[in-house]
Amino acid sequence: MTQTLRTKNLKPLVFVVVLTALVSRADIASESLPPALLGSAGPLQGETLNYYGNAAGYLVAPEGQGPHGSVILIHEWNGLTDRVREVADAMATEGYIALAADLYSGRTGSNPRENMALVRETLADPGTLIANLDAAARYLNARHDSTGKVATIGWCYGGGVALSFALGGVEHQATAIFYGRLLDDPEQLKRIDHEIYGTFAGQDRSISVDAVNRFVTALRSAGVPNDVHIYDSVNHGFWLHVDANPEVRSAPALDAWNRLKRYLARTIGS
């Protein structure tokens, strides 16, 4: 496979650390950010979808007959929340059928202890996780308004699950990982047959810069094309929670969003 690594500068590091100076923090903070970043688009537009067992997913489709590409959104460690549903709405506005998956069978955690219990319970049964996402992908592919092209997008816990799905799930065309757990074994990564998108945080204490560099090195060794960036001034969870520190998080979150839109356009765009 011909490698088309999209990281901008390969000297001397495996990949570039993207500075928030790409865009002025003050300029971004004073502007209206897109709803995908702040969840400010108003009432939710979608509906609950029971697509697998007790999974209560959230489905929203764009206007028009299509056909449209599809995205599966995979939640953070606390479960499927309205914040992820808001991103699904934003994806529909961009022209994609969006299904926010539910990997916790309708449950959400309200504190770190509950969140970690849900993470451990579900990661202990990876077959069920993959079956859940397989069902989501098959549902999307079977829709009359679907192009049959599917991407997964996951944050934190969901980012790691998205990578696992890229290794062992039904056919899909794109995987976007936001600060999720990684692998650095080229032999395993050779099973991926599509470009990988990655957004990571330079101040992340759980997914280190070294870990991300090893991941990119392994992707390159495996011949997997990728668009992976680290944003140096932010920490874990920044993209879904810009409002917690907008002065610092707005610029990198907006850059990551624009990269994601370009990635989806070239991988699943109709």
Question: Where do the model's predicted regions map?
Answer:
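Serine-hydrolase catalytic machinery in alpha/beta-hydrolase-like enzymes
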Residues: 32-145, 239-242
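C-terminal catalytic histidine-bearing segment of alpha/beta-hydrolase fold enzymes
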Residues: 220-270
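Alpha/beta-hydrolase fold nucleophile elbow
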Residues: 144-155
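A conserved short beta-strand
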Residues: 171-181
